[in-house]
Design a protein with these regions (language model features):
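General small-molecule cofactor/ligand-binding pocket signal
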Residues: 36, 99-103, 154
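Small/aliphatic-rich secondary-structure junction motif
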Residues: 1-63
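Glycine-rich, Arg-bearing micro-motifs that act as flexible, cationic patches
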Residues: 122-147, 162-165
Length: 167
């Protein structure tokens, strides 16, 4: 029985398509829906630039407060994009969303950790992000999640939409 699900989004071009699948499944099963977006950690170059311009205290403050601000902003962006996509009739669907979480880390690991932490019954993902070329049918994150997930994975194919010209 499916009582709760996790929709993992990259906030890319095809995120609204995958979201529609997630909401339709949540409606069908009358299930709770959680949303997660992974934010890659800051690269070494960016970190070294910050270190050269900020003292240790300012750097620590940036890491704690800056990251919290960015994460809160992304969480709000996700909710706003859902509202925009669903329109006025979608308020009931929005009520199914229990939480939007933005977590820093490797995307596949973040998704798998959230599956376990939230004890969801189903994971919903797209086949790949907007950055992967048409010759790659399955992205790195989707591949790792499929291989390592301990719950069923609902995989939304994005290649067909690209071939039809995004109608």
């Amino acid at each position: 029985m499916i009582r709760s699900m996790l929709y993992a989004t990259d906030l890319g071009l095809y995120a609204p398509l995958v979201m529609q699948h997630a909401l339709a499944l949540a409606r069908t099963f009358n299930a709770d829906l959680y949303v997660v977006h992974a934010v890659e950690p800051m690269g070494l170059f960016a970190e070294s630039v910050l270190q050269s311009y900020l003292d240790e205290q300012a750097l620590n403050e940036f890491h704690s407060q800056g990251l919290k601000t960015v994460i809160a902003s992304i969480e709000q962006r996700v909710l706003d994009s859902f509202r925009e996509e669903l329109g006025d009739e979608g308020e009931q669907d929005l009520q199914r969303i229990c939480a939007v979480r933005v977590v820093q880390g490797d995307p596949a690991q973040v998704i798998l950790d959230q599956v376990q932490k939230l004890s969801v019954d189903l994971l919903i993902v797209g086949t790949h992000s907007h950055g992967v070329g048409a010759e790659t049918p399955l992205g790195r994150t989707a591949t790792r999640v499929l291989q390592l997930a301990k719950v069923p994975v609902y995989l939304v194919p994005l290649m067909e939409r690209r071939r039809r010209g995004d109608r």
